[in-house]
Swiss-Prot record:
NCBIfam families: PRK09814.1-1. GO terms for biological process: protein glycosylation. Homotetramer; a dimer of dimers. Pathway: Protein modification; protein glycosylation. Dimerizes via the C-terminus; dimerization is required for tetramer formation. Binds protein substrate via an exposed loop in the N-terminus. The lineage of its organism: Bacteria, Bacillati, Bacillota, Bacilli, Lactobacillales. HAMAP family: Gtf3. InterPro entries: Gtf3. UDP binds at T16, R179, S249, H250, K251, S252, A253, T254. The gene is gtf3. This is Glucosyltransferase 3. Belongs to the Gtf3 glucosyltransferase family.
Length: 334
């Protein structure tokens, strides 16, 4: 018997979906899991028989009764995913669906597909969901799987020496302003440094642009000191789509892995974890975020940095992913 895990290739190297699956697979392979590689492509170029042969090749190493962790979605469409699951059922594999994203919730125009996704999830022996909020949402939508595990936090594995963060009264934001346009005109007293190509903004905006940088470069720059800002696509939390409160933020893991505290909105699914562990601040507005940084003392900052330092080790070594993967395997084999 083997434990297998699916992985994704063929997307842009900047794709968060690809990076997340690659990271989880890297950590799973440290546990001895076998990789099943998917390529992102136009599945409609395949006939049904061609798709079947493609999946047979991908699954050639899967044995009868194996455990398979399916990182969902493959982004090749539900037809591809369902065909893969159907073949696993023939092999009587134990199926663990590791839900990274739920497209019908992520894209409201695709909500009509929700019953089909729930049906796919219900074929699992266990599911891993990002948060308690996502679990409750999927149960309300018809999820019937008994064994549900909570991920809670993304890991951010890396292997390079970082700086020791020093107090700096500024905020970082790692994300394209095309997706977060309300940050272009940031006018609060606390300076905001955005890792994104420069955009035209109000001359009075207190914003500077750092351009796009690689993951190692980003960690190195963040680790010099400051605080990491996590925020949604809307300025006002009341206007934020529901989905951002169901999934878990990659940004928060990046900042914490770099060793700096975070400021997150109260609707973030793991905001309570950040509050309880003293890893930063939970706020209800960007104005409050700026005010907190303005009033932060060097001593308060260094106390937080020390707590973040210990927590960042968990993210660097991949303990959140490893734990939930091991727990899931234990569940389906018990």
């Amino acid at each position: 018997m083997k434990v297998n895990i699916t992985n994704l290739y063929g997307m842009s190297g900047q794709s968060t979906a690809l990076i997340a699956q690659n990271d989880v697979t890297k950590l799973a392979k440290q546990l001895g899991f076998n990789e099943l590689s998917f390529y992102f492509y136009d599945i409609y170029s395949d006939s049904q028989s061609e798709l079947s042969r493609r999946l047979d090749g991908i699954m050639a190493s899967v044995g009868y009764g194996d455990v398979v962790i399916y990182q969902s979605p493959t982004w090749n469409g539900r037809e591809f995913d369902q065909a893969f699951i159907s073949k696993l059922k023939i092999l009587q594999a134990k199926l663990i669906t590791f839900i990274h994203d739920v497209p019908p919730l992520m894209f409201p125009s695709n909500y009509y597909l929700m019953p089909e996704y729930i049906d796919m999830y219900n074929q699992s022996d266990a599911v891993i969901v990002p948060s308690e909020q996502m679990r409750d949402k999927l149960l309300a939508e018809g999820l019937t799987v008994n064994k549900i595990l909570i991920q809670r936090m993304w890991d951010h594995p890396y292997d390079l020496p970082l700086h020791q963060p020093q107090f700096a009264p500024k905020l970082y934001f790692a994300g394209s302003v095309e997706r977060f346009p309300h940050l272009i005109n940031w006018s609060y007293a606390t300076p905001l440094e955005i890792f994104s190509p420069e955009e035209e903004s109000n001359p009075e905006a207190n914003v500077s642009y750092c351009g796009w940088v690689s993951r190692p470069e980003l960690l190195l720059e963040l680790s010099k000191g400051g605080l990491g800002l996590v925020w949604g696509v809307e300025d006002n939390p009341a206007d934020e789509p529901e989905y951002y409160g169901l999934n878990i933020s990659h940004k928060s893991a990046t900042y914490l892995a770099a060793g700096i505290p975070v400021i997150v909105p109260s609707y973030l699914s793991n905001a309570e974890l950040i509050r309880e562990r003293g890893l930063g601040f939970v706020v209800d507005s960007l104005e409050e975020a700026s005010r907190i940084v303005e009033n932060l003392t060097v001593e308060e900052y260094q106390d937080m940095v020390e707590r973040v330092r210990k927590f960042s080790f968990l993210l660097k070594e991949g303990y959140f992913s490893k734990k939930v993967l091991i727990d899931a395997v234990m569940e389906v084999l018990s």
